[in-house]
Amino acid sequence: MLIDTHCHLDFPDFEAERDDIIARAHASGVAQMVTISTRVRRLPELLKIAEKYPSVFCSVGTHPNNADEELDISADELVRLAESHDKIVAIGEAGLDYFYDTQKPEDQKTGLVRHIEAARRTKLPLVIHSRSADEDMAAILREESDKSAFPFILHCFSAGPDLAKTGVELGGYVSFSGILTFPKSQDIRDIAATVPLNRLLVETDAPYLAPKRWRGKRNEPSYVVNTAEVLAEVHGISFERMAEITTENAFRCFSKMTRV
């Protein structure tokens, strides 16, 4: 049994065959999925999916690459929305993305801090997107954690070892995607080996980043199996044991998510 802790089932890529995609996930041993918000205004679409499929849960938040679209969304509004539905089990994804020069860093930081406050108040995990922003992300995580702890996930981890270490030291989870399986990702596998077993999660980030076995294809939740296999190899344990560990970690992290 596995949990795909991060996918985007509301994206147009899946619209025509969502039933089949979720059926394939179940057939491959992926029991539950969390479909992640990239814009707060799309929450109704995510909830429609989560309400239709018992095994699908969702989050609420604004992706950093959309930060300027939703600067009016306050922490209070995020809290209100997060507490409005049983299927909303996380805040985000929010964070910092300096790879694409499309959003002002200050707008991204403002949004991130609001999402942190919402995670702190709701006790729901904040799904953090961090790309080419290791130093600023680590500094904000430390500063905000010094104020008061909050649960978080470093999603689709592809950063450096220092950010992984900071995340673990602050009590966060580190989630690995299909990037872990790429031949050129030995550095990410080396970092994954340093993350304690009780802090590991697996995800697809579908429809993006299909694992090596399906490279070049549209990603989907069933493919998280390949990522879990590689993560098991990295830690020198069986696939079955890694599946058990990451599933229990997912339920501990997403404490509002029920078992179905």
What are these regions (language model features)?
Residues 1-260:
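Mid-domain alpha/beta scaffold segments of enzyme catalytic cores
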